[in-house]
Amino acid sequence: MTEYTSEALYTIDEHETCLSAVRDLGTQSPDGVLFKRPLNFEWVDVTVADFLDDVYSVAKGLVANGVEVGDRVVIMSDTRYEWTVLDYAIWAAGAITVPIYPSSSTSQCEWIVGNSGAKFAIAEKSGHFTRLSTFVKDGDRPEGDTSAHLNRVLEINSGAIDILVNDGK
């Protein structure tokens, strides 16, 4: 087998993250278009500044809901703008994203939620919401308990982003 290598064109700092890269871009070019997203049957521009505002507003809502550094937060959704905002907001809050495929069965969800130790979840649709809501329990997860135990589930299609933004005010 022949192996090929080349010198790296750049280096990534030890503390550089996807979030810090977008923050840096926001400093350099806040009005640059980062996304186009559907809104009211039209495609609208989302600037770097708009995206970062969304991210930090949602991150504050996650923290207001008890999400702490190192916590795991489930996202069960197809790829969409809100998924990206939530992913970055989870990172901004110091938490860890636990993705679950939208096609996952209830038993698969139960294993992922339990195994990851996630305590908060965001679902895209009502079916996903129903599936994840079966794991909502009162109180904190007991030490050493590996069963699925969520404190809260929100649904993107029912205003999860707005709820989190309001919770963070």
Where are these regions (language model features)?
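Flexible, non-catalytic linker and terminal segments flanking ANL/adenylate-forming cores
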Residues: M1-T17
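Flexible, glycine- and charge-enriched loops at secondary-structure boundaries
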Residues: T11, H15, V44, V48, ...
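Active-site-adjacent beta-strand anchor residues
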Residues: I12, M76, I122
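A short N-terminal helical cap/helix-turn-helix that marks the beginning
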Residues: D13-L34, D53
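Tryptophan-centric aromatic hotspots in well-structured domains and transmembrane helices
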Residues: C18, V22, W43-D45, W83-T84, ...
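Conserved AMP-binding/adenylate-forming core of the ANL superfamily
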Residues: L34-Y88, S105-G114
